[in-house]
Every structure is written in structure tokens, then in C-alpha cells.
Swiss-Prot record:
Transmembrane segments: none annotated. GO terms for biological process: DNA recombination; DNA repair; DNA replication. This is Single-stranded DNA-binding protein. A motif (Important for interaction with partner proteins) lies at residues 165-170. The lineage of its organism: Bacteria, Pseudomonadati, Campylobacterota, Epsilonproteobacteria, Campylobacterales. It holds the Pfam family SSB. Homotetramer. GO terms for cellular component: nucleoid. It comes from Helicobacter hepaticus (strain ATCC 51449 / 3B1). Residues 88-101, 115-156 have a biased composition (Polar residues). GO terms for molecular function: single-stranded DNA binding.
Length: 170
């Protein structure tokens, strides 16, 4: 089955960072995502979804270094169900997201202080990708731009290529 979650929201608390016995970093964050909609009576409604997110490796360390309560981020990952027994013996469960990539959406702060120094950050944020292995992490910077999809330094006059569909190998 396909399990993919993409969510944008704001941190509900500061990042909680700890290290696993293997030495890999694990960060837990709370995320709130708002949805505004029009009710049947025409008034505006809003619902908020709260969910915990787990980040591993370098992404966890970057989140701890740069994110604070209220920071806006985009998370791509997979939905997980955690189950446990509480102190009274009752079975409890909750959904969490295990992050595979994180993108900071807040712009750089103005003034002399720049917490993004010595990183691959741009005005639109920073993106970190991780796979499930704590020992394998990749960092990619996002291209410079105004953050809108479909913009950038792309050629304007792209010639049309005449290829028969049977020549395409897939």
C-alpha cells in the first residue's frame, strides 16, 4: 500500500531532541495545521489538526537548531500508529508522522542576526530529506526564487521534439 503524507503547519512547541543508543538524533515536534472553509450558512469555519512528527538524523539536528514554537514547516512522510498501555493498563494509541523530508517555510529574519549562516538556505527556506536509515541523510537546498511553483530561470523558448510514442521505452 502507498502511505504518503504531506502537511504544512506551525510548531505547537519547541523541538524535543534526544539521541538514540545508536547515536542517531531523534526530534519530536508538535504540528498544528489549519483548514478554513465556508459553512452551509455562508459563515467561515476553521478546524485545526494537531499531530506529532518524528524526524531522524541530520534533519532532527537541523530542526532543533533552527525551528521554534510557531515556525512554519512542510513535512513529507508516512503516517504511523503508535500503541501502548497507560499507567492504569488501558490501551492507548495515536497517529504520528515519521518525516522523510522537511522544508522550513519561514523566511530569513531581518537584521544582522542570521541563524541560517553556513547552511544551504535560501529566502524560501531549507529542505532536508532523510530515508528511514538513521545513518543515511541527504541535504538539498531549494532553488532561489519567490517560492511560487513554476517560476525560476527556465528557458522560455523550448523547441518541440517530434518523437513517436513507440520510441519511448516506457
Amino acid at each position: 500500500m502507498y502511505n504518503k503524507v504531506i502537511i504544512i503547519g506551525n510548531l505547537t512547541r519547541d523541538v524535543e531532541l534526544r539521541y538514540l543508543p545508536s547515536g542517531s538524533a531523534l526530534a519530536t515536534i508538535g504540528l498544528a495545521s489549519n483548514r478554513r472553509f465556508k459553512k452551509q450558512d455562508g459563515s467561515q469555519g476553521e478546524e485545526v489538526c494537531f499531530i506529532d512528527v518524528k524526524l531522524f538524523g541530520r534533519s532532527a539536528e537541523v530542526a532543533n537548531q533552527y525551528l521554534r514554537k510557531g515556525s512554519k514547516i512542510l513535512i513529507e512522510g508516512r503516517l504511523s500508529l503508535e500503541s501502548w498501555n497507560d499507567q492504569s493498563g488501558a490501551k492507548r494509541s495515536r497517529h504520528t508522522i515519521t518525516a522523510e523530508s522537511m522544508q522550513m517555510l519561514d523566511s530569513k529574519p531581518s537584521g544582522d542576526e542570521n541563524p541560517y549562516n553556513n547552511t544551504n538556505a535560501s529566502n524560501t527556506g531549507m529542505q532536508h530529506n532523510t530515508n528511514n536509515s538513521p545513518n543515511y541523510n541527504q541535504t538539498h537546498s531549494q532553488p532561489q526564487g519567490n517560492g511560487n511553483i513554476g517560476t525560476g530561470n527556465y528557458p522560455q523558448n523550448i523547441p518541440e521534439i517530434n518523437i513517436d510514442d513507440e520510441d519511448i521505452p516506457f
